[in-house]
């Protein structure tokens, strides 16, 4: 039995013999099982080669087909895939579960002016013998991976070398900017190897996608996919690269066996990402990023509700589409647990020893939380009394914020807290006391935190946000993380002049982290609700299928 979704199957053979096949019942989001009957009895140890002739649908939930107008170059179409969590089945029949790992090789035929890339080693190219206008690219991935990590992109791509094992790929218009933005990749890789062990994947290339890519990054092996919203111009959003690099160990080598245990992938990856940041930019910076993550978690839980079972670290996903529950919870609640354990068990040096041993123990396997916990107990066997004091049940199975808040170094956060408090406490008559000098010693990271703190409070009076624009000119800032929080702040304060800017950001790019909250806020504001729905319906056809589905739910257009 194989998973499929919106696929047509024409013929199946097993070891060259025709095999009978039938489709089972179609499921709401899981697709349709393909049941193949072997034409002969299999003996133990006998190999069977199953060949399937099939075709995917133009509406495949794993693929976005962009018209030339939707690309930077405006000349050629573009295709990219996004298989996580359960969309690989919408490209080809497979065992679409992270419990199963496989190696793969592929040949991709494309028009010769375009380039094909996959989450694999590039094994060269040749003219297509069947069509002189096309060429064939060869790929092989020799490390076993879950099929959610199979990825394909086709477009007018160019590359720049930014390290001994790293090319950055993008359309011509963005490739030099991307090469500058991600120049720290090799330093991050070296730091990650030092923390987590050898990098087993060979190459580490980066691909910058068109703006509709729905995530910040996707850790496809050998070829990380990233959103162009990371191109801030000052490398300030490079923590996403550290995050995707970290997945080369946590997620891609040690993998969650089911999506309920997604925190094993993401919590450990955020932990490693921040350890890399700590090595490169100092321990205070790591604590500052960790505190920002705690705010992000507070924000998510405010949105979802603190009794909502999807805020459990290990949610129940029976008959639940993993895409529909995607949030910062597995990332930030998972990280908070690891950061708390680090502080409980003897500090960063002690805890990284555990993480390295954990990766060695479970590399190339898929595991559940109980495997992780048993290994934690065996590694820290002399500290079992400390571990027994942890409220495991609340951490794993209770909704809302974690039962314990870790300790954070506040050095870099204090300026953000002080400035946000000044704005919160300010009366109309105090607004003249603010000036552009307030921000002169603050980094982009601190501006993000300042705005995040304001977003956790009751909305500011509209006079305050108008004054903020006057003195800080946030509208002129293109850093996507700053702009996103600033526009949310404006809409929450019901500043009508911000409506077109928020709609523009929600539709100019399709990273769900930005697009969904902006649309939700615009929908909550009576003055922009109808326009938000109208704008969504106008742009829907050009949106990524997953983004379109989830924004449709947010705006009550789909059930």
Placement of each model-derived feature along the sequence:
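Acidic/His-enriched low-complexity segments
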Residues: 1-206, 216, 303, 326-329
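Generic detector of ordered secondary-structure context
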Residues: 4, 44, 84, 98-100, ...
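Hydrophobic alpha-helical and helix-loop surface patches within well-folded domains
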Residues: 9, 14-17, 30-34, 139, ...
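Short, loop-centered acidic/histidine patches that primarily coordinate divalent metals
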Residues: 142, 209, 521
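Short loop/turn hinge sites at secondary-structure boundaries
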Residues: 155, 282, 304, 457-458, ...
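Long, ordered, helix-rich scaffold segments
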Residues: 327-334, 343, 351, 359-370, ...
């Amino acid at each position: 039995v194989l998973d499929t979704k919106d696929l047509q199957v024409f013929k199946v053979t097993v070891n060259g013999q025709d095999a009978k096949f039938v489709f089972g019942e179609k499921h709401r989001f899981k697709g349709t099982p393909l049941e193949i009957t072997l034409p002969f009895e299999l003996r133990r140890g006998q190999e069977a080669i199953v060949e399937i002739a099939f075709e995917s649908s133009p509406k495949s939930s794993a693929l976005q087909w962009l018209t030339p107008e939707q690309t930077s170059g405006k000349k050629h179409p573009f295709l990219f895939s996004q298989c996580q969590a359960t969309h690989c089945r919408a490209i080809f029949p497979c065992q679409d579960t992270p419990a199963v790992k496989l190696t793969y090789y592929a040949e991709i035929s494309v028009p010769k002016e375009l380039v094909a890339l996959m989450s694999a080693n590039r094994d060269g190219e040749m003219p297509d013998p069947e069509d002189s206008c096309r060429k064939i690219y060869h790929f092989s991935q020799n490390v076993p991976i879950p099929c959610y990590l199979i990825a394909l992109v086709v477009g007018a791509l160019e590359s720049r070398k930014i390290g001994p094992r790293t090319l950055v790929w993008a359309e011509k218009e963005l490739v030099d900017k991307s090469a500058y933005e991600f120049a720290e990749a090799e330093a991050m890789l070296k730091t990650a190897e030092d923390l987590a062990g050898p990098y087993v994947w060979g190459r580490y290339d980066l691909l910058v996608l068109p703006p509709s890519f729905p995530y910040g990054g996707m850790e496809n092996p050998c070829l990380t996919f990233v959103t162009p919203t990371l191109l801030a111009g000052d490398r300030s959003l490079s923590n996403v690269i550290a995050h995707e690099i970290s997945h080369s160990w946590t997620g891609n080598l040690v993998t969650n066996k089911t999506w309920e245990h997604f925190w094993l992938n993401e919590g450990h990856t955020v932990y490693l990402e921040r350890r890399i940041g700590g090595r490169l930019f100092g321990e205070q910076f790591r604590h500052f990023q960790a505190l920002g993550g705690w705010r992000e978690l507070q924000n998510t839980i405010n949105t979802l509700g603190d009794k909502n079972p999807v805020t459990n670290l290990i949610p129940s996903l029976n008959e639940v589409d993993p895409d529909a529950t995607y949030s910062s919870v597995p990332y930030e609640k998972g990280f908070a647990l690891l950061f708390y354990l680090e502080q409980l068990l003897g500090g960063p040096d002690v805890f990284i020893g555990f993480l390295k041993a954990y990766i060695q123990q479970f590399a190339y396997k898929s595991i559940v939380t109980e495997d992780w916990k048993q290994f934690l107990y065996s590694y820290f066997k002399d500290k079992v009394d400390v571990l027994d004091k942890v409220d495991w049940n609340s951490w794993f199975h209770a909704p809302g914020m974690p039962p314990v808040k870790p300790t954070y170094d506040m050095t870099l956060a204090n300026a953000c807290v002080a400035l946000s408090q000044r704005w919160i406490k300010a009366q109309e008559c105090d607004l003249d006391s603010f000036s552009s000098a307030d921000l002169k010693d603050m980094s982009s990271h601190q501006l993000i935190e300042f705005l995040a703190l304001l977003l956790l409070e009751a909305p500011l009076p509209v006079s305050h946000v108008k004054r903020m624009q006057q003195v800080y000119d946030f509208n002129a800032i293109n850093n996507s993380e700053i702009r996103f929080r600033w526009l949310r702040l404006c809409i929450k304060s019901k500043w009508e002049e911000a409506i077109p800017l928020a709609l523009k950001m929600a539709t100019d790019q399709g990273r769900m982290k930005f697009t969904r909250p902006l649309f939700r806020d615009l929908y909550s504001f009576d003055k922009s609700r109808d326009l938000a729905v109208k704008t969504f319906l106008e742009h829907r056809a050009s949106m990524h299928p997953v983004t379109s589905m989830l924004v449709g739910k947010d705006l009550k257009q789909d059930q």
